[in-house]
Curated annotation (Swiss-Prot):
Family according to the record: Belongs to the sulfate adenylyltransferase family.
PANTHER family, A to Z: PTHR43509, SULFATE ADENYLYLTRANSFERASE
The keyword Nucleotide-binding is annotated on this UniProt entry: yes
GO biological process, one term: sulfate assimilation
GO molecular function terms listed in the Swiss-Prot or TrEMBL record: ATP binding; sulfate adenylyltransferase (ATP) activity
InterPro entries: ATP-Sase_PUA-like_dom, PUA-like_sf, Rossmann-like_a/b/a_fold, SO4_adenylyltransferase_pro, Sulfurylase_cat_dom, Sulphate_adenylyltransferase
Gene3D superfamilies: HUPs, Sulfate adenylyltransferase
Annotated organism of origin: Geobacillus kaustophilus (strain HTA426)
Name of the protein this chain belongs to: Sulfate adenylyltransferase
Amino acid sequence: MSVSIPHGGTLINRWNPDYPLDEATKTIELSKAELSDLELIGTGAYSPLTGFLTKTDYDAVVETMRLSDGTVWSIPITLAVTEEKAKELAVGDKAKLVYRGDVYGVIEIADIYRPDKTKEAKLVYKTDELAHPGVRKLFEKPDVYVGGEITLVKRTDKGQFASFYFDPAETRKKFAEFGWNTVVGFQTRNPVHRAHEYIQKCALEIVDGLFLNPLVGETKADDIPADIRMESYQVLLENYYPKDRVFLGVFQAAMRYAGPREAIFHAMVRKNFGCTHFIVGRDHAGVGNYYGTYDAQKIFLNFTAEELGITPLFFEHSFYCTKCEGMASTKTCPHDAKYHVVLSGTKVREMLRNGQVPPSTFSRPEVAAVLIKGLQERETVAPSAR
């Protein structure tokens, strides 16, 4: 029997809708990504974090992929304010955390500091090029960081995905109700095609259940929109997966595109949701050619199994082999690449937007139909909206 222990040993809960807001005399405006982070800290998804990073923890995370106490943590979770706003704030202040006029939380300010963004970019993203979407977001943010413990006082409106939002305490309860002792998490910002289905089902052979946890926070403009992806996941699970072995729930964080570091981060978060295993494929959380194909797998070697507390499952690039007449990878298929059905994400998106159905050896026809319909509807609406 295997049981997932929250990262750091305790599932953090910073939710208090009755917090006395009149104690918070200052105000900080959040970005959409910071709002997501606030809620994920508050609900324990980012355990052991209890707030936005202070300089001591920030420096440790950027330089060592650990918090100052040595706990594995690879992505800096920060709250940025302008120089003008920073002049209004002082250590010891309590500030309301506001998004579009609504107060979602309070921070007890423990630190105000100016990060070295170039250093953060080079160490976290492995580049300081503004062409990298994560780096661009980093440099677009204000130049001062505010650290301190938070209290979550209001939950965000989950909209059309409301029935798929689950806090870590809820997923842990669900997995226990299902009788799942071992659960594998799968992170994605893309539709699930045959290659993803193959590695998920390979993982399902050795665990009790699959937690399909697609990211629905901020992504790149050319990524498939979340609403279309969610419909495609549902039709795939309905037609091709055992219903008692899979659980679908969304992950509201913004995409960082930090490649290897984000793979560690995604694993730690799924550990908090109750997963005992986590799938790491090729170029996990990558973008462009900034990371090596399997860098996101190699980075796990920097930590012991005990430090991670979740078992990464590494998979090589998968494809349909016409000679094997089935899904395979370079580990299991001896045939030449000319027998492999491989399409780039860019090529597939182009086909779908043009109404072309990818081969069934690449994508399930039901999934392709949903994606084509959704993208074409989006295209007809988009020109008038631009």
